[in-house]
UniProtKB/Swiss-Prot annotation:
GO terms for biological process: tRNA processing; tRNA splicing, via endonucleolytic cleavage and ligation. SUPFAM superfamilies: ADP-ribosylation (SSF56399). This is Probable RNA 2'-phosphotransferase. Keywords: NAD, Transferase. It comes from Deinococcus radiodurans (strain ATCC 13939 / DSM 20539 / JCM 16871 / CCUG 27074 / LMG 4051 / NBRC 15346 / NCIMB 9279 / VKM B-1422 / R1). The keyword Transferase applies.
Length: 283
């Protein structure tokens, strides 16, 4: 289990407000896909998603939005820019409160008094936060894999964004109505390679690929992160962010979108996937 932090304080620097967390000696390295929130007695942690890459010779950064908590040597201090939400431990009151804009709070359905904590976590040191379930739960490591797929945390909600058609004839009815959901898996898997998508889709019959508008999703507050084996993951994809096309016909909608929206760009910062005027990735 993660050990308690020694200090947690806010400081002002050139980059604005930052949350500084100093961890105890013996803090275990945490790898893999892991969305986390610190739950520490009498401490508050203000955190912002950060995509700063690991620098050579530097200890790992806490990459919250990417869902990765890297190895942090004992005595090392990590600083994170503060975002519009704050995860606050309230062991005495037994709930976790969020500092979110009111419009996002309403869309997420978060109660004003905060999110109830699992009683087992009141004295715990770390937990995974699932906004969709309104509760915190402890993250147990898998044997030989470290802390991986311990939970999910959605800190955004679908708002006003570019709407892309998904209701073309032949699209599965369930996907048209509900979009892509993880069902029994932890997350929805995405692929940037049409060949890989075709192989996976052909396992259960004829392959039908869906282009995911990751640019619009990201602007709406959804998170994308990458697993150790290179698969892109997200919590869910609403139907309005999908475009259906057949792999067999090689009708890639990017050819149409390029004419209307200009040249392709590369989303190195957010997803590393080729982007076609706001649409990237194949799910």
């Amino acid at each position: 289990m993660l050990r308690r932090a020694q200090t947690c304080r806010s400081a002002t620097g050139n980059g604005g407000l930052k949350a500084t967390v100093t961890l105890q000696a013996g803090f275990p390295g945490v790898h893999g896909v892991y969305r986390h929130a610190e739950v520490l007695s009498n401490l508050s942690v203000s955190m912002r998603p950060t995509f700063n890459p690991f620098k050579r010779g530097q200890a790992a950064l806490l990459k919250l939005s990417a869902g990765i908590l890297g190895r942090l040597p004992s005595g090392h201090t990590a600083s994170l820019p503060i975002h519009t939400y704050t995860v606050i431990n309230s062991a005495a009151r037994g709930h976790c409160s969020f500092s979110l804009p009111q419009n996002r709070r309403r869309r997420l359905g978060l109660p004003a008094e905060g999110v109830p904590l699992d009683p087992a976590l009141k004295n715990g040191a770390c937990a995974s936060l699932s906004v969709r379930r309104w509760r915190l739960f402890s993250a147990a490591p898998r044997a030989g894999e470290g802390w991986r797929h311990a939970g999910t945390r959605r800190v955004g909600a679908a708002g006003a964004a570019a709407r892309l058609p998904a209701g073309q004839p032949g699209a599965p009815d369930a996907i048209r109505r509900e979009g892509l959901r993880p069902v029994h898996r932890h997350h929805v898997s995405l692929s940037a390679d049409t060949g890989a998508a075709q192989q996976v889709g052909a396992r259960r019959g004829r392959a039908v690929a869906l282009v995911v508008a990751t640019g619009a999703l990201r602007e709406a507050g959804y998170d994308f992160f990458r697993s150790d084996n290179g698969v892109w993951l997200t919590d869910t994809v609403p139907p309005e962010y999908l475009i259906r096309f057949q792999i067999e016909s090689r009708t890639y909608p990017g050819a149409i979108l390029r004419g209307a929206h200009g040249k392709n760009t590369v989303l190195r910062r957010w997803t590393g996937i080729r982007r076609l005027s706001g649409c990237s990735g194949i799910g």
